[in-house]
């Protein structure tokens, strides 16, 4: 973790130098990851919104069979949420509809990465016959992240059922994942 702590601190310093006063972090690593981020942030003048994540990802078969989150992981979620601002889901393709509905009961911030890549968008349709954004709505998210490959219909649903979409054009450009249709998003 020493290298990770070093790079996390370096990132926080870089954000401050560039004028960032608040950031939202989709923190991997479960409770340990959240506590590590809190340690890094102690004594820094930046505001953070930490969205934790448990290390549990369902297989295609579990998603098709609509398997719930096991109780042992529910207990991890409870502990996680005592130490962070909400839940940050990596995507609907790692979760069954049932588990997304379980996450929707969380009373803190709920957010999810969605339609980030063309591959993830198509994978959702292949596994469930539903688009990734449509399935993500089962979470009742406060916001969606990316929506790079969302259809007009997906954007319409998101505009009615979330507070908004967080776009990441700089990350998308550096990863060559495409550019979201921000103009269309603004028109919704």
Mark where each language-model region is.
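Alpha-helix-loop-beta-strand connector modules within alpha/beta enzyme cores
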Residues: 37-53, 106-107, 111-112
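Active-site core of metal-dependent hydrolases
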Residues: 56-60, 71-183
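Short coil/turn connectors at secondary-structure junctions
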Residues: 43-48, 83, 161-162, 188
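Short, compositionally biased "basic patch" segments
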Residues: 1, 39-47, 116-127
């Amino acid at each position: 973790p020493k290298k990770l702590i070093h790079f996390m601190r370096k990132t926080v310093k870089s954000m401050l130098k560039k004028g960032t006063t608040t950031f939202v972090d989709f923190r991997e690593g479960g409770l340990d990851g959240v506590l590590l981020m809190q340690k890094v942030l102690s004594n820094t003048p930046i505001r953070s919104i930490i969205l934790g994540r448990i290390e549990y990802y369902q297989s295609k078969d579990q998603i098709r069979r609509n398997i719930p989150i096991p109780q042992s992981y529910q207990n991890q979620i409870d502990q996680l949420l005592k130490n962070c601002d909400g839940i940050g889901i990596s995507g609907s393709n790692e979760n069954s509809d049932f588990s997304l509905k379980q996450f929707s009961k969380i009373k803190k911030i709920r957010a999810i990465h969605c339609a980030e890549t063309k591959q993830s968008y198509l994978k959702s349709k292949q596994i469930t016959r539903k688009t990734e954004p449509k399935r993500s709505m089962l979470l009742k998210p406060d916001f969606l992240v990316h929506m790079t490959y969302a259809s007009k219909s997906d954007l319409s649903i998101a505009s009615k059922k979330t507070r908004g979409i967080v776009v990441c054009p700089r990350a998308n450009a550096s990863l060559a994942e495409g550019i979201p249709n921000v103009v269309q998003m603004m028109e919704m």
